[in-house]
Amino acid sequence: MIRDKISVSIQTLRWKCIESRAYSKRLHYGRFALSPLRKGRADTIGIAMRRALLGEVEGTCITRVKLENIKHEYSAIIGIEESVHDILMNLKEIVLRSDSYGIREASIYIVGPRNVTAQDIILPPSVKIIDTTQHIARLTKSITSDIRLQIEKNRGYIIHSSNNYQDGIFPIDAVFMPVRDANYSIHSYGSGNEIQEVLFLEIWTNGGLTPREALYEASRNLIDLFIPFLHGEEQNIDGMNNKKGSNMLPFPLSHVLTDTGETKEKIAFKHIFIDQLELPPKTYNSLRRANIHTLLDLLNYSREDLMKIEHLEKESVEQVLEVLRKRFAIDPPRN
């Protein structure tokens, strides 16, 4: 049977940047629209893009600092106003941009007295500082400051042990996430079977990438995830007839099918870090010393457990609980 008329949509899917702002060197905003989409597709794309933007876009950070003749993070340095800990926290705030991979070396060589800012960092050619006004330290005496830095480009985050100091080398908890936040919304139009949707994406970055660049990278990463499905299905995936040189899955399929204990919520909470909760520095440092690095770590503690954390006062605990209630509608249980 041949249909007399076949209705074919010739509309082309298009995207457009409808708003772009730089509120500061370290806060950029972009709003994008994608249309026309069939009903339901906007939500599918929006969920995937938000996750890719927040978790898959690469960033550049200072990951290690070397200070001569310093043994502890909370040591005081003669002639420098800040403690080692304060200097490390200031270095962590520096936003970098790099077009190359691998470990890069940088340094600071300054003679006091004077203020030291990000502008004083001697960088390799492939690395750029977004905001050179970031304060690092204040030298109060006529001393020489020689600081060595290690810079890496990566994705996600790296959490170091707070006591892992050797030969004056101090690792820094690095958050390789240039996208500070991402949201999406959907607008529907039309009626009946002709309903179509417009997807709006909002992206905030720290200046290490523009929102447009972050959108490109997240899109490429999503495409890469689906490329394997475009090739022929691998044979013998059940582990039978495993001949030398065959392309087998690198794990037992039965293990994957049964190991599904983690819930979606737990997976999401693993990727929310406590430095994103905007807690006061004293509260943040107390939680970090207790090896609480993510929201999932924090939710393993009851109210009473939080009260037992060293240097975490009752007022600080209340601040943590208030953030959990307002931002996540979570009320930790009592023992």
Curated annotation (Swiss-Prot):
Family to which the UniProt record says this protein belongs: Belongs to the RNA polymerase alpha chain family.
Reactions catalysed: RNA(n) + a ribonucleoside 5'-triphosphate = RNA(n+1) + diphosphate
A Pfam family matched in the record: RNA_pol_A_CTD
SUPFAM superfamilies, per the entry: C-terminal domain of RNA polymerase alpha subunit (SSF47789), Insert subdomain of RNA polymerase alpha subunit (SSF56553), RBP11-like subunits of RNA polymerase (SSF55257)
Record protein name field: DNA-directed RNA polymerase subunit alpha
Entry's localization field: Plastid, Chloroplast
Keyword Nucleotidyltransferase attributed: yes
Keyword Glycosyltransferase: no
EC number: 2.7.7.6
Chain residue ranges for the region called Alpha C-terminal domain (alpha-CTD): 264-335
One GO cellular component term: mitochondrion
Alphabetically ordered keywords of this record: Chloroplast, DNA-directed RNA polymerase, Nucleotidyltransferase, Plastid, Transcription, Transferase
BP-aspect Gene Ontology terms: DNA-templated transcription
Gene label: rpoA
Organism: Pinus koraiensis
Domain comment (free text): The N-terminal domain is essential for RNAP assembly and basal transcription, whereas the C-terminal domain is involved in interaction with transcriptional regulators and with upstream promoter elements.
